[in-house]
Amino acid sequence: MENTMWEIEDQNYEAGFKIICGVDEAGRGPLAGPVYAAAVILPPHAQIPGLNDSKKLSDKRRRELFPVICQQALAYGIGIATETEIDEINILQATFLAMERALAQLKVQPDLALIDGNREKDFGLPVKTIVKGDSLSANIAAASVLAKVSRDDFMIAQAEKYPQYGFDIHKGYGTRAHYAALEQYGVCPLHRMSFLKKFYEQK
């Protein structure tokens, strides 16, 4: 991991914050499955080689980093919001709910949360949003990996229950194969109906 991944944290340490966590989500875009979020507090300048935005890493590399992050972290938490909650309160609010649940699992209380993106929410502690934070902040990058691997594992497990959809391959995203399965089999309980309105309106 390059030292540049600690620049944002360093600025905030210098501003007086002592315990900084990173927060990121996985699964905002899929047609099926929950949205996951993770919150991670790494020790200052923890060196985790190859840590970067999880979207830029191979699945193999993410899985190698997952236990390293969990081992090195001062604290971490993983939260989800279900597909039912996504349909009820919309994906943005459900993402915030998953983040809130991840933060609630932290066994160490942070005094600042760095959150990937540009949407702020009151989580009961100081928050700073960082666009592309998953490639700029070590803590957000670590959270990105935990959220992505956790969600992928969940969707792979669901493929055993609903083998006709190929969740182990596309993880619920709107691939051609996924839409073809929807045409043939209809929806299952994992599908986000609010994401499928246009699909069914066109039929």
What does each model-found stretch correspond to?
Residues 1-203:
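RNase H-like, Mg2+-dependent phosphodiesterase core
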